[in-house]
Amino acid sequence: MFLFTRKYKPLLGLDITTSSVKLIELSLAGGQYRVEAYAAEPMPVNSINEKQIVDTEAVGEAIRRAVKRAGARSKEVAVAISGDAAITKVIQMPRNLRAADLEAQVELQADQYIPFPMDEVSYDFEVLGPSEKDNDSLDVLLVATRTENVEQRQAAVTAAGLTAKIVDVEAFALENACKLMTHQMPDGGIDRTIAVVDFGASSTTFSVLRALKVIYTRDFAFGGQQLTEEIMRTYGLSMEEAGRAKKEGGLPGNFQAEVLDPFIDDMTQQVSRSLQFYLASGSGR
């Protein structure tokens, strides 16, 4: 279940990917966030396939190792599903509805926008504010996913001895993170269009935010794994050896010119292509 608007005591932020699990624990004092604990642990091979958790115990064990390495104290966790596993839709609701009536009305209408049987779906909603389309209506963000996507993450977190309090969507988690960085943005990010590139092991997500809201996102199959594989081919290393060399160094002197620079060029072209797709989509208008 998504829990956009509810407040909890500090949680562990958990990023579960095909290559690793990353964890962070923050505290808030005097209006400033402070990192209390963080860690990253490699994900066992084949425990996640195409963003689906297929080995709950292996993922849970990786999470447990990350918690131990970080020395994190909280036992409650926020996780997220990928954007392509979620359905999002802004719908309009009468402005004069009470909170309980609004929830009932969303429940009645949700099946119009969700192409799955409702008993197989987890969904939640958030009121965005007055609608620009109709003065008598509210814009309401409806978000849904197959329940199995939520349960997979809950089960892995439970296997690690933790409790999943929030199951979010990565794009909305990105929005929330960007809101914490406004002091580093021109004009505090207000009325600004900002691109964010989330560079992963096997895929990269290119997102565009306007006024700190995601208005465009594109995933493409390119990531650090390509660099690892090129190191393997060039120097005759195993996957494990190449991954270690990539992180710790010690590669021959021609690594920069022969391997790294061409990889960076490819990465730059991929990001540039995503920017062109965004401009052509009309989302920027």
List each language-model region with its residue ranges.
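Glycine-rich phosphate-binding loop plus the immediately following alpha-helix
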Residues: 48, 148-176, 213-253
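Phosphate-interacting basic helix/loop segments used at nucleotide- and nucleic-acid interfaces
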Residues: 7-8, 58-71, 180-192, 270-279
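Adenine-nucleotide phosphate-binding core of ATP-dependent small-molecule kinases
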Residues: 233, 242-285
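A short acidic Gly-Thr/Ser loop motif
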Residues: 14-21, 82-84, 191, 196-203, ...
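Active-site neighborhood for divalent-cation/phosphate handling
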Residues: 76, 80-182
